[in-house]
Amino acid sequence: EADRCNDVPEVFATMPTQIVEISHENGRRSVIRARMAVSARQRAAGFQHVCEAEIARFPLLFVFDRDVRNRFHMQNVQVPLNISFFSRSGRFISNQRMPRPLLGQPGKLYGIESSYRYALEFSSDELQQLLSRPGKIRIVLRR
């Protein structure tokens, strides 16, 4: 099997990176660089078949062109992930932990009941702590 760190999937390599600002109602701001899954093909691929080191480098922001209620799975994903959902205006809605499925077990689907525009997948504990703070949180995509 190829070393996945040296051999990222072709569709993953097409995902651009962009600066995303995370602002908290207390005035605190953090800036991250995230990969952007904007096409249907990029969103379908996500972090599948991507090595742990590459997943740790950049969070992955799924950008939809309308509000959706899509579900996410963890098949072919190397590490457990967190996923945070955001509204069209960038307002934080909620987050979930997505463990890797047990070998031979059907994978679970993850999502939320309300619609959302953005979903951010990541493995970073620091980012999880940032998004778990009480109070209103918003993301802004820097163009």
Task: Walk through the language-model features, giving the residues of each.
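Compact, glycine-rich, soluble single-domain proteins
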Residues: 2-143
